[in-house]
Amino acid sequence: MVPRDLVATLLCAMCIVQATMPSLDNYLYIIKRIKLCNDDYKNYCLNNGTCFTVALNNVSLNPFCACHINYVGSRCQFINLITIK
């Protein structure tokens, strides 16, 4: 299952690409540019979340996190109470 924050960030990035380069296969264009964050953001995601960024035209967009199932939030900072039993 893909984290909602990741989906929202990808959709936002796709809107930017569509506005600037409408003739490209936007989905694949974005997916190919997702990279792990560099060391500057090694502690950006909390609770063992994984930090990613999208590089468009040699510019990295804001980092975003893929959270473990028990955490949510833009930086995985909240406990997902729905998954706690």
From Swiss-Prot:
Gene3D superfamilies linked: Laminin
UniProtKB keywords: Disulfide bond, EGF-like domain, Glycoprotein, Growth factor, Secreted, Signal
InterPro entries membership: EGF-like_dom
Cystine residue pairs: 37-51, 45-65, 67-76
Main location: secreted
Keyword Thylakoid listed: no
Localization per Swiss-Prot or TrEMBL: Secreted
Any one cellular-component term (Gene Ontology): extracellular region
MF (Gene Ontology): growth factor activity
Database matches in Pfam families: EGF (PF00008)
Record's keyword annotation contains ATP-binding: no
Position of the signal peptide: 1-19
Domain EGF-like, first and last residues per copy: 33-77
Glycosylation (residues): 48, 58
Source species, domain of life: Viruses
Entry function: Stimulates the growth of some tissues.
Protein name: Growth factor
